[in-house]
A protein has these predicted regions:
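A structural boundary/capping signal
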Residues: 2-215
Length: 215
């Protein structure tokens, strides 16, 4: 009987020991992921207090700019170049207000959140090849998908990132490439999707054939 009792105690001990090891392993894994998240946050903090359109509007003149064609590459680049100084001032203001340190990833996210949250989506009656000047979009506060894409691309370029436009049937959005971040891969900026986070793209758009236009 004593031998059987000792064996039962041994089995219970082994079960408790295995359970303790399992709990310790789960705890260690959880702590590891928490430490990784904390490290990433310290490396690339999230934007806070992204300014409103009303605040940014104080930096703009009242006069609206002329629209231009979106399918003439030289004209798109020229318009962005001509508005660079104004756009750079606005981009720097948004970046400085939103990020406590000069982190390019945080600043890029702040610019995306500003356009996504502050610019209202106003669809065209038909998808055509005319775009509003990015300064006009900031002044009116409304834009279709093409206009939002050009504005975002201009803002991202103003802080030193690469940017390009992506066209799919009936829609357009922007992409950004940030130096020394994720292998400088192209990240999606879909500002018309109010639920999309930085880099995300709705599935119905992700599967479509795309034409890319770096600016």
């Amino acid at each position: 009987m004593k031998q059987e009792h000792d064996m039962e105690d041994e089995i219970i001990y082994e079960k408790k020991s295995s359970f303790t090891v399992f709990v310790a392993l789960i705890t260690a894994v959880a702590l590891f992921f928490l430490s990784v998240q904390a490290y990433l946050y310290l490396m690339h903090p999230q934007p806070v207090d992204v300014p409103s359109l009303a605040e940014v509007g104080r930096l703009l003149e009242a006069e609206l700019e002329k629209p231009f064609s979106s399918y003439r590459s030289n004209e798109v680049k020229k318009v962005i170049a001509d508005t660079h100084d104004n756009i750079k001032q606005i981009a720097n203001y948004i970046a400085a207000r939103s990020c406590r340190k000069a982190d390019r990833v945080c600043q890029s996210k702040a610019l995306y959140q500003f356009v996504r949250n502050e610019i209202s989506y106003v669809p065209d009656e038909s998808f055509h090849d005319q775009l509003e000047n990015p300064l006009t979009v900031l002044k009116t506060g409304g834009a279709d998908c093409e206009d939002m894409a050009v504005l975002l691309a201009a803002l991202e370029k103003a802080i030193g990132n690469k940017a390009r436009l992506v066209f799919v049937p009936g829609h357009a959005y922007a992409q950004v490439s940030i130096p020394d971040y994720r292998g400088e891969k192209w990240l999606n900026l879909e500002a018309t999707c109010k639920d999309c986070q930085f880099g995300e793209l709705p599935n119905n758009i992700a599967i479509q054939k795309k034409d890319y236009y770096e600016i």
